[in-house]
Design a protein with these regions (language model features):
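Extended, folded cores of ATP/NTP-driven motor/assembly subunits in large transport
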Residues: 1-452
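The Walker A/P-loop phosphate-binding site
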Residues: 19-52, 465-503, 510, 689-715
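The start of beta-strands in P-loop NTPase/AAA+ ATPase cores
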Residues: 55, 147, 524, 707, ...
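Switch/coupling segment of Walker-type NTPase motor domains
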Residues: 60, 64-70, 96-123, 137-140, ...
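Short, flexible loop/turn elements at secondary-structure junctions
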Residues: 61-63, 99, 153-157, 397, ...
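P-loop NTPase motor domains
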Residues: 73-88, 333-336, 431-486, 540-546, ...
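Conserved P-loop NTPase motor cores
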Residues: 352-354, 482-485, 490-505, 509-517, ...
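P-loop NTPase motor core of the ASCE superfamily
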Residues: 497, 572-638, 789-903
Length: 903
C-alpha cells in the first residue's frame, strides 16, 4: 500500500512555489479483490493517516423503471424508505447516475458483426446502422446511462474485532507489546487479513442484503477490474492499464499482486490530457469543462410518491440534457442531536411568538417554524430517521461558453422553493468528493453544506429512477423519455416477440431491422408473408436485395412435399430423435386438419376427431418404421434436389396406403374405426388430386437451405385452401428451423391462420415448446383480437414475453386493455395522432412491453433500410425507378436513401 507523496517545493528561477500532488487529494491506497464462493467482489481501499481505513464497494444497479403501474408505487417507495432507515451509523451510500452521448459500445458490437458477415449486402446495412448510431450520438439523442452505488465500510485497525471500549483498549495494548517484541509485521499482516474478512462479512454482505432484499433493487457487485476501468475512464480515453497493486483475499488467505511500484493515482495520470486543471468556475479534464451545481434550498415537497421518486429523473431525462452526472450521498445523522436541534427551534419559535404577542403583533415565521419543528419531531418519534443528503450535479461541455449556457438552463429546471446554484469558489473540491476514491463525505468539508432530510423525504433526492436498458445485445430502440438505448435480444437467448401496429405504424421497418440483425449473427430466418394483390410484400424487395442469402418462394407455384423430413445430419443423435419426433407431431396435426378441417365455429365430433387422431398416429408410426420408406428418404437426400431419387422421395400418396387395418395390424375393426379409416382415405385422396393438394403431395421443387426463406401465401381461393397452403409453408419453415440449432420463425399478418384451430394450435405449441428446438417465434398483427379468439391464445400470449406495440387505431384500445391487460392510460397513448411515425427525425414510436415492464421508445431506422423495406405504393414506385436507373443495387438504394432524406 502506497504512502502519501507529500507537498514539494519547486524553484523556478528565483521564485519558489509549493505544490500539492493530486495523489494526496485522493485517498486510494490499493484495489481489493475478494473471491469467495465463486464470486469476485472488488473494492477500493482508502487510507487517511496511518491507521484509518475505509473500504468502498461498488454495485452496478438496474434502478427503478421510470414507468410504473399504480399498484407498484407504494411498495417500491416503502422499500426504498425502509432501506434508508437501515443505513449503518458512520457509513454512507453514494448513488451515481450518469447520462452521456456516447456510442463506443454499440459501435464495437456492430463492428464485430461487420467482421463476421461475408455478405456485401448485409455489410452495407450494418455500416448504414453504424452511421445512424453515430448521427444520433452527435445530435444528443442517444444517451446511454449508468447507475452505480458505492457503499462504505469504515474500520479503525487499532480496534478491529473489538466490540466495546475495554476491548479496544486491550487491542491497542496488544499492538504496543508486539511492536516491542518484534512481532508487529506479522501481526499487521494478520490484522489486515482480519480487516478485509470483516469488511466482506460485516460490510459487503450487509450492504448487498440491504440493497437487494430490503430496498428491492437489482444490483450486481462490480469486480476489481471493472472498478479500476471505471476509475481509469474518469481521467483517460485510452486502453486501460493493468492494476498497479491488487490485494487478493480468498479461501487461501491474503496476498498482494504488484504490477507497478507507482502510486495507483499516479498511474491514472497517464498524460497531460489526464491531469485535471482547476478553476473557480470549472474543472478541465479529458478535454471537457466540468461545471458543478448544488442545492442551496430544498424542494418544497411533492404531490405524491411517484412524482417524488421521479423528481431528479424528470430533469436529467430532458431531451436537451446530456453529458450530465448526478451524485447523491446519504449518511445517517445523529438522531439525538437532531431532536435537540428541533426542540431548540421550537423553543425559539415559542419565544418569538410570545414576544410578538407582547408587542400586539403576530410572528408568522415563528408559527411556521414551530409547526415544522413539531411535525419533524413527530415523524422521528413515529420511526422516521434523519439523514444527511448531499447532492451535486456535474455538467460536461467542450467549451466554457457552452458550459455557462448549460448551467443556466439546468438551474432553470428547478422550481422555487428549490434552488440550485452553480459552485463558483471551489468546484474542484466538490468534483473530487464526487469521485469514489476520496475519503471526505460529499459536501461535508470544508463546510457542511449537506441538507437534513427525514427518511420519508430523502427518496425524492435519490437518482434511482432510470429507463431499464433491456438486454445487453440485440436490435436497438431509443427510449422516448431520456434517450436511453433499449435493446431486445432474441438472438443470443430464447425469446418470442409480438409486433402489433396498424397500417403505416412502421412495422415493416422494425421487422426488417429484426431480420437483418438475425442474419448478421448467423441465425436462419423463415418468414410466412402475405403479399398484396400485385405480388409485392414487406419482404419481397428485401429478399431480392439479399440475393445470395435469401430465397423467395411463391407457395402456389412451387411444390412442397409435406412428407419431406428435415435434414438433421448436422445435429447430435439425441437431438435428431427429439426433433424428428417434433416434425412427426406436426405431420399428425397437419393430417388431422386435412381430414377433419375444424374451422373455428364449426361443430366437430370430439370422439370422432380423437379416433382419427389415433389412427393417423398409428399410421405415421408404421410409415416411418418401414425400412423401404427409410431407404427412399436416404437415397433422396444423397441424390439431392432434382435427382431421380429425389423424385422418388415418399409423399402423401405413399402414406395413404398405410391407413388400413392390415398396415395398422388390427386383428378386428369396429364400425366406427372402419368409418374413420374410410374418411381418412377419402379426404387424403381428395387433397392428392386437388390443385392445392398436388403441391403438397409432390416432391419439393426448391431446396430450403438459404439463410432467409420467405414463403409468399397468395392466390388462395377459399379459406380451406388457405389453411392447407399455410400448413405447407409451415412444414417447410419447420423443416428449416429444426435443421438448425437456433432459428427465427416470423409469421407476418396472419389473421387467416388463426381461423383454423389445428393451425393455431400448431403455432401455440411452437410458442410454448419452441425453446427446446431453439425456435424463436415472431408474430406480426394489427391487433390481438384474432389471436385471442383462437383456442391456443393462452399458449401464444403467455409465451410472447416481449411485445412491441406501435400506433394503433382508437377502436383497438379496448382490445389491448381487455386481452393483454394494458392500463388504458398507457395504451391510450398509442392511439393518439402524435404516435404516428415522424418524418422529421425519421423515427417510429413504440411501446415496449418486456415481461410487464412498459417503455415508450423510438425506432430510428437507417436510411438504406428505409429505402429497402418501406412498402407504401409511392415508396415502392420510387424504389423500382431507382433500380431501373442504377443497375448496381447498392448504389440504387443509396441514391433512394438520399432522396428520402431530402424529402
Amino acid at each position: 500500500m502506497i504512502k502519501k507523496v507529500g507537498k514539494r517545493e519547486l524553484k523556478v528561477g528565483v521564485k519558489s512555489t509549493r505544490y500539492t500532488p493530486l495523489e494526496d487529494e485522493m485517498q486510494l491506497a490499493s484495489m481489493i479483490s475478494m473471491q469467495f464462493a465463486g464470486r469476485s467482489v472488488g473494492a477500493y481501499l482508502l487510507r487517511k493517516g496511518s491507521d484509518n481505513f475505509k473500504i468502498k464497494f461498488a454495485f452496478d444497479c438496474i434502478g427503478i423503471h421510470n414507468t410504473l403501474r399504480d399498484e407498484e408505487i407504494d411498495s417500491i417507495f416503502a422499500a426504498v424508505e425502509g432501506g434508508l432507515k437501515d443505513i449503518l451509523p458512520g457509513e454512507s451510500l453514494t448513488i451515481h447516475l450518469g447520462s452521456f452521448s456516447v456510442d463506443s459500445e454499440r459501435q464495437e458490437e456492430l463492428s464485430d458483426l461487420y467482421r463476421q458477415v461475408k455478405s456485401t449486402e448485409l455489410r452495407y446495412l450494418i455500416m448504414a446502422e453504424r452511421s445512424r448510431v453515430r448521427e444520433l450520438r452527435n445530435l444528443g439523442i442517444r444517451k446511454p446511462k449508468y447507475l452505480r452505488l458505492y457503499c462504505t465500510y469504515t474500520v479503525d485497525p487499532g480496534s478491529a474485532g473489538a466490540s466495546d471500549a475495554i476491548e479496544k483498549v486491550l487491542v491497542r495494548l496488544e499492538k504496543g507489546w508486539k511492536r516491542f517484541v518484534g512481532e508487529y509485521d506479522e501481526a499487521r499482516f494478520n490484522q489486515v487479513d482480519g480487516i478485509l474478512n470483516s469488511a466482506y462479512t460485516d460490510g459487503f454482505q450487509i450492504w448487498e442484503a440491504l440493497l437487494s432484499n430490503k430496498m428491492g433493487l437489482t444490483v450486481r457487485a462490480m469486480t476489481a477490474a471493472e472498478m479500476w476501468q471505471q476509475l481509469w475512464e474518469y481521467f483517460n480515453e485510452t486502453q486501460v492499464r493493468e492494476i498497479p497493486q491488487l490485494l487478493v483475499l480468498d479461501e487461501s488467505g491474503l496476498r498482494e499482486e504488484v504490477s507497478s511500484e507507482w502510486n495507483p493515482l499516479t498511474v491514472l495520470m497517464e498524460s497531460d490530457f489526464s491531469i485535471p486543471v482547476a478553476d473557480r468556475k470549472w474543472v478541465h479534464v479529458k478535454g471537457k469543462y466540468v461545471g458543478v451545481l448544488t442545492f442551496l434550498e430544498k424542494p418544497g415537497g411533492w404531490g405524491d410518491k411517484y412524482k417524488q421518486m421521479l423528481y431528479l429523473w424528470q430533469v436529467i431525462s430532458r431531451e436537451a440534457i446530456a453529458d450530465t452526472e448526478i451524485v447523491c450521498e446519504v449518511a445517517r445523522a445523529n438522531q439525538d442531536i437532531v431532536k435537540t436541534q428541533m426542540q431548540r427551534v421550537a423553543k425559539q419559535a415559542i419565544t418569538a411568538a410570545e414576544i410578538s404577542t407582547d408587542h400586539h403583533s403576530v410572528d408568522v415565521m415563528a408559527a411556521i417554524n414551530l409547526k415544522r419543528s413539531v411535525a419533524a419531531q413527530e415523524s422521528i418519534y413515529e420511526g422516521d430517521v434523519p439523514l444527511y443528503v448531499g447532492v451535486a450535479f456535474l455538467l460536461h461541455r467542450s467549451t466554457t461558453s457552452k458550459l455557462d449556457d448549460a448551467c443556466r438552463f439546468f438551474q432553470s429546471l428547478f422550481v422555487s422553493p428549490a434552488w440550485v446554484a452553480r459552485e463558483g469558489e471551489y468546484p474542484w473540491k466538490i468534483w473530487l468528493q464526487c469521485l469514489p476514491v476520496t475519503w471526505d463525505n460529499l459536501m461535508a468539508v470544508p463546510f457542511n453544506r449537506r441538507k437534513l432530510y427525514l427518511s420519508g423525504e430523502a427518496p425524492g433526492l435519490l437518482p434511482l429512477v432510470r429507463t431499464k436498458p433491456g438486454d445487453a445485445k440485440g436490435f436497438e430502440l431509443i427510449s422516448d423519455d431520456g434517450g436511453t438505448p433499449v435493446r431486445v435480444d432474441l438472438y443470443y437467448q430464447h425469446k418470442n416477440l409480438g409486433l402489433f401496429g396498424a397500417t403505416r405504424s412502421g412495422k415493416s421497418l422494425l421487422a426488417g431491422n429484426v431480420v437483418t440483425y438475425a442474419l448478421a449473427v448467423g441465425l436462419p430466418v423463415v418468414i410466412l408473408d402475405y403479399p398484396k394483390p400485385d405480388g409485392t410484400s414487406t419482404f419481397s424487395d428485401y429478399a431480392k436485395f439479399l440475393k445470395h442469402e435469401a430465397a423467395y418462394f411463391d407457395i402456389t407455384t412451387e411444390a412442397n412435399n409435406i412428407f419431406e423430413i428435415p435434414n438433421l445430419k448436422g445435429l447430435p443423435s439425441s437431438l435428431q430423435k427429439e426433433r424428428m419426433d417434433d416434425y412427426i407431431d406436426f405431420l399428425l396435426s397437419a393430417l388431422l386438419s386435412m381430414v377433419v378441417g375444424s374451422r373455428r365455429g364449426e361443430s366437430t365430433d370430439a370422439a370422432f376427431s380423437d379416433m382419427v387422431r389415433s389412427i393417423l398416429g398409428l399410421a405415421l408410426k408404421a410409415f416411418f418404421a418401414d425400412v423401404l420408406i427409410r431407404d427412399r428418404y436416404a437415397a433422396a437426400y444423397k441424390g439431392g434436389l432434382g435427382s431421380q431419387d429425389w423424385q422418388a422421395m415418399p409423399t402423401l400418396a405413399d402414406f395413404i396406403g398405410y391407413c388400413s387395418h392390415e398396415r395398422l395390424r388390427m386383428d378386428s375393426i369396429a364400425g366406427d374405426s372402419k368409418g374413420a379409416i374410410e374418411r381418412i382415405k377419402l379426404r387424403l385422396r381428395f387433397w392428392v388430386e386437388s390443385r392445392v393438394g398436388k403441391a403438397l403431395a409432390a416432391p419439393s421443387t426448391f431446396k430450403n437451405d438459404a439463410q432467409l426463406l420467405v414463403f409468399a401465401l397468395r392466390g388462395l381461393s377459399n379459406d380451406e385452401d388457405a389453411a392447407q397452403m399455410a400448413l405447407s409453408a409451415y412444414s417447410a419453415a419447420l423443416r428449416r428451423a429444426l435443421a438448425s440449432a437456433a432459428s427465427i420463425f416470423f409469421i407476418d399478418e396472419a389473421p387467416v391462420l388463426f381461423e383454423f384451430d389445428a393451425i393455431s394450435n400448431l403455432i401455440g405449441r411452437l410458442c410454448a415448446n419452441g425453446a427446446k428446438s431453439g425456435i424463436r417465434v415472431i408474430l406480426s398483427a394489427q391487433d390481438p383480437d384474432t389471436i385471442a379468439k383462437s383456442p391456443a391464445s393462452a399458449k401464444i400470449f403467455q409465451n410472447l414475453s416481449t411485445r412491441l406495440v406501435g400506433r394503433i387505431q382508437p377502436a383497438a384500445v379496448d382490445s389491448f386493455a381487455t386481452i393483454l391487460k394494458y392500463p388504458r392510460e398507457v395504451i391510450g397513448r398509442n392511439a393518439a395522432e402524435s404516435f404516428f411515425p415522424k418524418r422529421t427525425g425519421m423515427y417510429s414510436q413504440w411501446l415496449i412491453d418486456d415481461s410487464g415492464t412498459f417503455t415508450f421508445a423510438r425506432f430510428y431506422p437507417s436510411l438504406p433500410l428505409l429505402a429497402i423495406t418501406a412498402n407504401n405504393p409511392d415508396e415502392q414506385k420510387a424504389r423500382q425507378e431507382a433500380f431501373n436507373r442504377q443497375p448496381d443495387k447498392i448504389r440504387a438504394i443509396t441514391e433512394l436513401a438520399r432522396m428520402l432524406a431530402a424529402n
